[in-house]
Amino acid sequence: YLMSDGIMHSMDMMTVPKKEFLQFFEEKVLQPRGLNFKVMFPGPTGTNGVEAALKLARKVKKRNQIWALMGCFHGMTLGALSLTSDAGSRGGAGVCLNDVTHIPAPYMFPELDTIKYMETLLTDDHSGVEKPAAIIIETVQAEGGVHVFSNEYLQGVRALCDKYDILMIVDDIQVGCARTGTFFSFERAGIVPDMFVMSKSIGGYGMPFALTMFKPELDIWSPGEHNGTFRGNQLSMVAAKAGLEYMLDHKVEAEVKRKEGIIRKYMDENIARPGVEIRGIGCIWGVQVADGKLALAICNKCFEKGLIMERAGRDNNVLKLMPALVATDDELMRGLDIIRDSMNELM
């Protein structure tokens, strides 16, 4: 595309790359799943996508409140940051982050029925909490420490939203694009959100690209109401289409499910040990160790051995494994061996 001297930026104007991406996404991704969604290009990053979803949800429902979960991460611009629960991230805002209520995530208090808790907030006239326009969730809290929410929980949130006229927004920025074994991470629960946001891997080759998708009846935007210079990045659209073609041609979804079995078996046999908690799905896994200092030492040791890995979780004590979905089995095993060897040296 670069060698053809194709147009690079077109704002909101229709171009051949934009048309081809939208047609391909509609015909090969949405239609086979029976999904009917409007596709919006909100800007180049995930936080842009979240901002658009929040703005539209509030406009549709004419309510200010949004509910998010404790332990979540949705972005660093002010609207998305108001959802993000991490105090370190929120502290840089410099202003009050209002109109968001944070709900306990289901893993925080196993004895608490958090769906029932939310329903009580909605029905008890002394709860002191306003009805939200939307509830936004990640199906896997990645930055929160790789906590995988159960299908039953996701179904419960969907039912709650339906019952009380609340929009359900899924943040699929980090775990979409087959990361969990299905293209959209919410597919495993058999639910369909009212809106969802994608970025990161949807760019095909590390290109900045984001999508905000919503049911057609929610499309009440006025012209120019949510615009931005880099919404029309043509190279990102070309890369995104090429990435989707590769995923379909190489059956990446099925490969991720197969690799999940390899990773799970390896974890059980080589990584599991006293003081270590393992959790994950597809090709995203968390290995929780005693503290952030140990996790940092393990990450540094892995880096010395040729593996890049970051930390996650409240105390940065979770090793976050996100291997490339297209990694070969040999490459996958090499990375896992590096983690094993590094942990053995330090634990």
Model-derived regions, located:
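Conserved N-terminal phosphate-binding loop of PLP-dependent enzymes in the Aspartate aminotransferase
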Residues: Y1-M347
